[in-house]
């Protein structure tokens, strides 16, 4: 049986053999692998780029106090970005499943059309959800626009739902029963690693977070992002864009933002992301290509 740790390592090994540069998770909280600079910023220029990485992801509104076997406020995506998109990308994906020990020919694999959008990143793309015996396990996206700019060449993003794949491969009904690792004769489960965190962060995000402080932090992060952009520093600016996005998500979980305000906050983060994209492209001398 493949452990969760082995699953991540096998995906890294497979995509490294396909020519992807393996980078490390980014050290700012974000809601998806797309937010990593290795995807968001690198998809903006015209140079070929292929990368893969584990993406710890936080979505405060999805927390369930560690009581739901299928919903988490923090989890792991595995992200692949290849630009330009290879013609055989679907075949490569199916081979990656084989590398995990899954014979896809014996299962019902479906590519279901599902176009993707990230309002806060000003990004959207055409693509599919990949369903394995009726369960979504992966998202394919051909980026059309990122940070409000057209993508040329078009990059393909593959986002694996690693916990769902692990549950399927290990034949367990709860994410907390996933075997994280086997250390000698000792088994470490997903619950051992993350269940307490799911409870505490759910309580924080839904009940405890200081909303006044977070509103102030959002304004501070936005202001610092813009200041960095004025200094033509898109990478530090993007860090503060990520911070503003995470603070917004926490305020959203805390129900501190009305429906009308929510749209305004999304637009504010989108403008920060667009500013980062614009200054980044400008620094490469590619703004005219947007």
Curated annotation (Swiss-Prot):
Keywords: Aminoacyl-tRNA synthetase, ATP-binding, Cytoplasm, Ligase, Nucleotide-binding, Protein biosynthesis
Record flagged with keyword ATP-binding: yes
Molecular function, one GO term: ATP binding
GO annotation, biological process: glycyl-tRNA aminoacylation
Pfam families recorded: tRNA-synt_2e
Matches recorded under InterPro entries: aa-tRNA-synth_II/BPL/LPL, Gly-tRNA-synth_heterodimer, Gly-tRNA_ligase_asu
Family: Belongs to the class-II aminoacyl-tRNA synthetase family.
Protein name as catalogued: Glycine--tRNA ligase alpha subunit
Annotated source species: Nitratiruptor sp. (strain SB155-2)
Gene: glyQ
